[in-house]
Amino acid sequence: MILTALLAVGCGVLVGFTLGLIGGGGSILATPLLLYVVGMQNPHLAIGTGAVAVSANAFMNLSGHARAGNVRWPTAAIFTAAGVGGAYAGSTLGKAFDGQHLLILFALLMILFGVLMLRPRREGSHAPAVLTPRYVLRTAGTGLGVGMLSGFFGIGGGFLIVPGLIFATGMPMIYAIGTSLFAVGMFGLTTAANYAMSGLVDWIVAAEYIAGGVLGGLLGMRAAIYLSGRKQTLTRVFAGIIFIVAAYMLWRSLGHG
């Protein structure tokens, strides 16, 4: 029990650290770490537990970005309102999906995420958003699609939400990161509630994960300040880690190890 608790806290620190250092992508490590380091045997239990931790850590990180003025609340509301319904539908489908097949798809999504991380990102407009019908429809449509993927895989989806917001609205990266945290928290909360209703959340491990995430997030944000000039290098290193973890998940899920 003590070893499991230490592993859960340690993994929470790692996820929180990567969230604080490079943004929303760190949440994608939550489920693999619960499965292969903490030692959870049930993929669905790992997804539900990870969703609780990701949601809590996202809301805690949101407060700092909100104080800095990095959250565009009207856009966050439109994106999240559409995405919550998608997250519920996606998580309902995910619970009914075979656990091992779900992990294979999860690993493939991780590879896609790694590729997206390596792509250069354009800087958007700093002007306040004008809520035209086209803007609202595009934002809501993107939110619905990202919410479904987030719920299906039990992840906060920050790595999908950030490029999704930039694609839909053209906002700068810093605003996309801040705005995404509200959606990450709400999508994760929706997924966690759906899994919890089926008894697929280990609340003790979730609490340990959250505690580690708080510490890791603080360390990650401090590291990001000191290493801001090397952020592209750090992103590439993290993408490499994602590829390695995805390859390991595929290897395990296909009957090896």
Regions found by a protein language model. Name each.
Residues 1-18, 31-43, 63-149, 167, ...:
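Juxtamembrane transmembrane-helix boundary motif
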Residues 22-31, 154-164:
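Transmembrane helix boundary and interhelical junction motifs in multipass membrane proteins
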Residues 43-47, 177, 181:
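Small-residue hotspots at the loop-to-helix junctions and early N-terminal turns
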Residues 49-63:
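Transmembrane alpha-helices of multi-pass small-molecule transport proteins
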Residues 50-54, 180-184, 205-210:
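Short hydrophobic/aromatic, small-residue-rich stretches within specific transmembrane helices
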Residues 55-58, 111-114, 185-188, 246:
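Small-residue-rich packing faces within the transmembrane alpha-helices of Major Facilitator Superfamily
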Residues 178-189, 243:
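Hydrophobic alpha-helical transmembrane segments of multi-pass integral membrane proteins
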Residues 191-196:
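Membrane-helix boundary/interface segments in integral membrane proteins
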